[in-house]
Regions:
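Non-catalytic, mobile gating and regulatory segments of ester bond hydrolases
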Residues: 1-116, 120-243
């Protein structure tokens, strides 16, 4: 992904939290917009075209129902043998899967599918991208997420990474949500960690990461680090530093 694409994708992760009527899709360059709102699961997303790209963007936690999906830690089977994923995240994806697949199939003129989301939306986007990579096997699949929790077991993580999905999982400083669920869950590749000044943070050893996390917990900054506004602000600083 180019730096322009990364910043655009992250802005879409924020825009999807608005009511449909309040989103200026035209100014975003999006056409053929299909808005999805599953009332039962409280899962929202949109499918749209922008040039040769088809976008699928998921909203994150925005209600009590979403929060209930977040806190469950049980795992259930997914696509390949050995895949186990978070039951709440899979429930959200299952609620909208058929309509999204139908909308994508109806659209034409694109050569890649870009899936985006924040928080719970990031987890659902990860499952969506993985699912789409098994259905649209001749189409490039990209996945750009911010503030994503861990989604599944190690087998799922390995199978996902082997699908050659062009993934960028962005972590803002000490975002608390990216540390959960803890036991038996793993992150998919590839991670870009940035601090509040827009600097890329290299891999930290466990004790260093834990220390920074604890410091942020004391100050409450790890909650702020999870907000889309923080991601956008820091990524804009990162963007301005790029050649």
């Amino acid at each position: 992904m180019t730096k322009e694409e990364i910043l655009y994708n992250v802005q879409l992760c924020d825009v999807v939290y608005k009511d449909q009527k309040d989103i200026d899709f035209k100014s975003l360059g999006l056409t053929s917009v299909k808005w999805i709102d599953d009332k039962k699961s409280d899962t929202q997303a949109f499918v749209a075209l922008k040039g040769k790209s088809l976008y699928v963007v998921f909203r994150g936690t925005s209600s009590k129902k979403d929060a209930q999906n977040d806190v469950s830690i049980d795992k259930v089977p997914f696509i390949k043998e050995g895949d186990k994923v978070h039951i709440g995240f899979k429930s959200s994806w299952d609620a909208v899967k058929n309509i999204i697949l139908k909308d994508i199939t109806k659209m034409s003129g694109y050569d890649k599918i870009v899936v985006c989301g924040h928080s719970l939306g990031a987890a659902v986007a990860t499952l969506c991208a993985y699912n789409l990579s098994h259905v649209f096997t001749d189409t490039t699949i990209e996945c750009c997420t911010i503030g994503s929790p861990r989604v599944g077991n190690k087998t799922f993580k390995n199978n996902y990474d082997n699908q050659k999905i062009k993934t960028l999982r962005i972590v803002h400083n000490n975002d608390v949500v990216t540390h959960s669920p803890v036991i038996g869950y793993y992150h998919v590749n590839h991670m870009l960690r940035i601090d509040r000044e827009g600097n890329i943070k290299k891999f930290m050893i466990d004790w260093e990461r834990a220390w920074n996390y604890l410091k942020s917990m004391v100050t409450g900054k790890n909650i702020k680090d999870h907000m889309t506004a923080g991601y956008i602000s820091s990524l804009k600083k990162w963007y301005d530093k790029q050649p």
